[in-house]
Amino acid sequence: MGQSKKLNKQPSSLSPLVQLAGIRKCFDGKEVIPQLDLTINNGEFLTLLGPSGCGKTTVLRLIAGLETVDSGRIMLDNEDITHVPAENRYVNTVFQSYALFPHMTVFENVAFGLRMQKTPAAEITPRVMEALRMVQLETFAQRKPHQLSGGQQQRVAIARAVVNKPRLLLLDESLSALDYKLRKQMQNELKALQRKLGITFVFVTHDQEEALTMSDRIVVMRDGRIEQDGTPREIYEEPKNLFVAGFIGEINMFNATVIERLDEQRVRANVEGRECNIYVNFAVEPGQKLHVLLRPEDLRVEEINDDNHAEGLIGYVRERNYKGMTLESVVELENGKMVMVSEFFNEDDPDFDHSLDQKMAINWVESWEVVLADEEHK
């Protein structure tokens, strides 16, 4: 996190595929999308991420044509599709339930859309088999859905969605019904398939890890509004506000008070009772309240014994959890605040552990912190 870990931002050369401008949507008189503008680029894997009820699925359904906008405009490849019926939008959707026809074989499920489009009969078999090969199911063509695993059914749904070569594929929480191991496998397969096909994917999820793993770009939503739009690394390491910081992964939030500005980048501040320098990229005044944000893996801890003195935030180990590659500890500061620390095991160093109630000093690399204004005291 913070300044020293920022990426070099490269200008995007991608061309817009979908443009939503001034979108507004109400249900039963309640405004769920108040004013939304969003551009989705050709060939990217974009994820709409947010808690239940944030409006992400509504945005997906508006793009698909399954809901109509109350105001605003939707463009697809520079064509206004705001009032174009769903079946004429060259957009396909994969739902959480997959919605396979149980009485049809895998082949017939995938061929269904082609038959509905009156595709010439001679083209159907090669196109269906090509789609099944893409998802590694060509040998399952004559099976029925009930003879497939959940992951295989999911891949059939994707094959059915891509067989007619849509410009855009929408996926609505389409991995959430799978078990953990299969979900991880399908995340990798979906991303690889998207690269292979070159089709733009828009994926809806509330699972932060899923979004970070699969996406070229993440749009974080709350209450029908976009809170932040950026790459997974930007969203994780440079959250724009406390909502994004708290929603994406674990994060520690320390209270701070400005003492003085030292230079263009650094501020001297009191952070949870300890004076230190922090990097602040906006104007501040002495006495102003701030939040200093640090991921558990960005903290450094040192055991304090009776015969040594250590600088930093002082606390005591209250919980520790071995996670294989990491040791996660909960440290209670002297003021009562709980801090999560994640330490990685290095195979070249001896293993370590901390006893409960062990006294600890917590520090971090200067400039790795993200500093935000206190939203209650702006």
UniProtKB/Swiss-Prot annotation:
Strongly inhibited by carbonyl cyanide m-chlorophenylhydrazone (CCCP), and by spermidine via its interaction with the C-terminus. Also inhibited by N-ethylmaleimide and p-chloromercuribenzoic acid. Partially inhibited by KCN. Keywords: ATP-binding, Cell inner membrane, Cell membrane, Membrane, Nucleotide-binding, Translocase, Transport. Pfam families: ABC_tran, TOBE_2. Gene3D superfamilies: 2.40.50.100, P-loop containing nucleotide triphosphate hydrolases. The N-terminus is blocked. Induction: Transcription is inhibited by PotD precursor, probably only when excess amounts of PotD are produced. One of its GO terms (biological process) is putrescine transport. SUPFAM superfamilies: MOP-like, P-loop containing nucleoside triphosphate hydrolases. It catalyses: ATP + H2O + polyamine-[polyamine-binding protein]Side 1 = ADP + phosphate + polyamineSide 2 + [polyamine-binding protein]Side 1. GO terms for molecular function: ABC-type polyamine transporter activity; ABC-type putrescine transporter activity; ATP binding; ATP hydrolysis activity; nucleotide binding. ATP binds at G50, P51, S52, G53, C54, G55, K56, T57. Transmembrane segments: none annotated. Changing E297 to K/D: Lower ATPase activity and transport efficiency. Changing D172N: Loss of ATPase activity and transport. SMART domains: AAA. GO terms for cellular component: ATP-binding cassette (ABC) transporter complex; membrane; plasma membrane. The complex is composed of two ATP-binding proteins (PotA), two transmembrane proteins (PotB and PotC) and a solute-binding protein (PotD). Belongs to the ABC transporter superfamily. Spermidine/putrescine importer (TC 3.A.1.11.1) family. This is Spermidine/putrescine import ATP-binding protein PotA. It comes from Escherichia coli (strain K12). The gene is potA.
